């Protein structure tokens, strides 16, 4: 999309490289999309889920902050690759896996972003329909149907129009949701029982780590596979440090405050904490006066839609990176259609939300954690910009397949799945096959989700050890990066 075209013109770019004349913005501009996508009332639900690990209020506070910041730091580091190659994340990963081999992580990314889009859109639909019912404007299935049409429709429009409209929308969403969220904090303050904070007993180290890894998987690790999609329009002389800071800060700051406030509410109201599993946003709304339900719904739905919009856009790019020959707009529309099916299933046919959600996060979180570790290592090792032409040529410097990368991915995934367990989703009972080393599936370490962090470390360490030579050969005759 050229700089001369208006915000409401449809983006023409697919997975091709952004040309020099089309590059624009500064690292600080990354604050808006990442803040908007993460200023979601849904984040407060993690306060209740964190306490569900059987840890104290202060343990949960520390673990959630650490999990949020570290996971989004990974997003910030991966975002550097966007301005180095000016192409989508799943195109840039071809330098690691090969032009043809990168179709595997592209497929994983497509599934992951689709799952996240369904999760966020479902929560937005539940929030909107719950408010419609509480205001007496409808009951039964009608509010859910109307909410689905409204939410999905807006997500599709933004996803189809593309990058410029998304960036403008995120700036507006940031301001609106920020103001209304402050209002929620003020109105909810009277429902906090500060004496209950110290009444929750401390938990074990495995429980603390389980909380931290769950938060990492639910926040930053859910965004790593699309990080470069939103930095790819930046000029190549943009500051690496600025990209990392503004991405990490923008994505983390709202979540830190929202989760902490959610912890305060959850520790003060056991019934609300229990109801979060079925209707995360609706449970939090139970403490509000009726007159504030509309503003609350606006901030809840806008925050969730912001994340859904980014997922819809990046999901289309991942599909194109896989090799599907479609216009980007058609790919975005196809993603939206699949999202509708997912939303209908979760909203009308699933008894609980958190069980399938945790199962999805854990299962796909493991291979994506391996990939994230590998990509972070690539960014650290690589000192020069990508050869953009070779990213599209299987016979170029990046080759068609990279056996080392797949070996690391397979080893990390197999070991990672062996160290995670999810009792809330029966279809994942096969996981945790390596936990017998540390007490079995019923032991104290079972709920720690060690597999996620082990997978991340294997991806990072494996690439640092075994892929330095490959990267050195790839960039031997390339010019030095501008920044």
Where are these regions (language model features)?
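Membrane-water interface regions at transmembrane-helix termini and the short interhelical loops
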Residues: 52-53, 80, 96, 104, ...
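Membrane-interface "cap" regions at the ends of multi-pass membrane proteins
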Residues: 1-58, 207-214, 232-242, 470-483
